[in-house]
Amino acid sequence: MKVLPVLFLTLLVLISIPAETFCQDYNHDRDIVPPRGKRNDFFRSDVSRDDESHPSPGQK
């Protein structure tokens, strides 16, 4: 039963390392991208386009 704690610790390390590097990359990229308003408009236009091209099953 000594294997379980070791597996758990290795899983934690494997999960935490990519999460930390991703957070650092995200914070670094946030300085470069335009203000949030433009970014939200971009996401909204993408969502509306998806809604038109993929109607929900009830609208057939």
Swiss-Prot record:
Residues of the signal peptide: 1-23
Primary location class: secreted
Region span, Disordered: 36-60
Alphabetized UniProt keyword annotations: Amidation, Antimicrobial, Cleavage on pair of basic residues, Secreted, Signal
Tissue: Expressed by the venom gland.
Function summary: Probable antimicrobial peptide. Has no inhibitory activity against herpes simplex virus type 1 (HSV-1).
Domain of life: Eukaryota
The keyword Signal is annotated on this UniProt entry: yes
Chain intervals with Basic and acidic residues compositional bias: 36-54
GO CC annotation terms, alphabetical: extracellular region
Modified residues (Arginine amide): 36
Family to which the UniProt record says this protein belongs: Belongs to the non-disulfide-bridged peptide (NDBP) superfamily.
Pro-peptide positions on chain: 37-60
Keyword Secreted appears in the UniProt entry: yes
Protein name per its UniProtKB record: Antimicrobial peptide Eval151
Subcellular location field: Secreted
